[in-house]
Curated annotation (Swiss-Prot):
Superkingdom assignment: Archaea
Annotated protein name in UniProt: 3-isopropylmalate dehydratase large subunit 2
Annotated gene: leuC2
Disulfide bonds: none
Family from the record: Belongs to the aconitase/IPM isomerase family. LeuC type 2 subfamily.
Length: 416
């Protein structure tokens, strides 16, 4: 019997013939932690008193509170740095960028097994890795031993057919899928993406979709690695890291989902759940106070390019705050070279240093009572951006940029 991508990777890393439902102990290739979760893992390691065997595969990031707005957070960041230096682990200081963007730019390879103390670790499936989030204690064990136990997930085959219409982007595709499945519709499943549209997507588009797999409960979201993946890695100077990762033709899936993307329209996720998805026509005209373009979901160069295309020569509506945050230092420099940063600033926007920015509600753009934000992030839970008395809509960078110009949630198609 053939295997899914999830079964193949977990079989290889556990040196076993594993199928969905099996429990395996697997060697982990890459481990990631951010400043909100790393202190918990480090303290757990200290409590265990165990030797750190996987320091060379462990990467610490300061991205959630970057730069730190409070003394307590500064102390945590110092604590992380000192531990990383002591054990010889990789440390990425404030300003380098978001954990998931840097992991894809520098470290994760197709076919890797990666874990992270962050729920959106599933992002790396966009380059053909099996990657998943874990709690800080489980990640501490991974750092100590270089391995951990996994239950091999059942897989849903998600067939994306057709071509994306004007004004419809990868973000719209994944929001539509989450709206159809519900927030728990794929709990502990691996979403494996196939079909004409998936094959034609750039890696940056795939990363957007993989990033949000967890929002319908999925353990992982995975695309096959192909020539697009090779080109993506080559642009990063990492072509040697490429390997082909594909499911077997006769792999068995728990469920098969078919989506004709040609029929899609721009969508948004309404407050206060990600699966509360509506077509743009249902919410168009809703006034917004803040627009946020960035995050590990949509802070890459192609995201900034489409936003800049809409904003160029236009102004942000009076009374609206536009915040743009590139996902990494590399993306920031690319945006500078292409003149995108100038476009955002001339339009009246604010461009912040690479990091998570307003997404987690620690600093940088906390909403006031009664305010509405449209954001390219991945979650819109009550209080997500620092105020439970505010509302968050999720959308593509194009929809967000169009809304910044209009001052209300707007259809991006009139600008494209």
């Amino acid at each position: 019997m053939g295997k899914t991508i999830a079964e193949k990777i977990l079989s290889e890393k556990s040196k076993s013939d594993a199928y969905a439902g099996d429990i395996v102990v697997a060697e982990i290739d890459q481990i990631a932690l951010q400043d909100g979760t790393a202190p918990l893992a480090i303290r757990q390691l200290m409590e265990l008193g165990t030797e750190v065997r996987a320091a060379d595969r462990t990467h610490f990031f300061v991205d959630h509170a970057a730069p730190s707005p409070r003394r307590e957070l500064s102390n945590d960041q110092k604590f992380i740095y000192e531990f990383a230096k002591k054990v010889g682990a990789d440390f990425n200081p404030p300003g380098e960028g978001i954990i998931h963007q840097i992991m894809v730019e520098r470290y994760v390879k197709p076919g890797d097994l990666a874990v992270g103390a962050d729920s959106h670790t599933c992002t790396y499936g966009g380059i053909g890795a099996f990657s998943t989030g874990m709690g800080s204690t489980d990640v501490a064990v991974a750092i100590a031993l270089g391995k951990n136990w996994f239950r091999v997930p059942e897989s849903f085959r998600v067939q994306l057919d057709g071509s994306l219409p004007k004004g419809v982007f990868a973000k719209d595709v994944i929001l539509k899928l989450i709206g159809d499945l519900g927030v728990d519709g794929a709990t502990y499943k691996a979403l494996e993406f196939h079909g004409e549209c998936a094959e034609n997507m750039t890696v940056e588009e795939r990363l957007t979709i993989a990033n949000m797999a967890v929002e319908c409960g999925a353990k992982a979201g995975i695309f096959e690695s192909d020539e697009n993946t090779r080109k993506f890695l080559a642009e990063l100077g990492r072509e040697g890291d490429f390997r082909e990762v594909k499911a077997d033709e006769d792999a068995e899936y728990e469920k098969e989902i078919y989506m004709d993307v040609s029929s899609l329209v721009p969508v948004v996720s309404k407050p206060h759940n990600v699966d509360n998805v509506a077509e743009i026509s249902e919410v168009e005209g809703t006034e917004v106070n803040q627009v946020y373009i960035g995050t590990c979901t949509n802070g890459r160069l192609s995201d900034l390019e489409v936003a800049a295309r809409i904003l160029k020569g236009r102004k942000v509506k009076e009374g609206v705050r536009l915040i743009v945050v590139p996902a990494s230092r590399r993306v920031y420099l690319q945006a500078l070279d292409k003149g995108l940063i100038r476009v955002f600033v001339e339009a009246g926007g604010m461009v912040l240093n690479p990091g998570c920015g307003p997404c987690v509600g620690i600093h940088q753009g906390i909403l006031a009572d009664g305010e509405v934000c449209i954001s390219t992030q991945n979650r819109n839970f009550k209080g997500r951006m620092g105020n439970p008395n505010a509302e968050i809509f999720l959308a593509s960078p194009a929809t967000a940029a169009a809304s910044a110009v209009k001052g209300y949630i707007a259809d991006p198609r009139e600008f494209l």
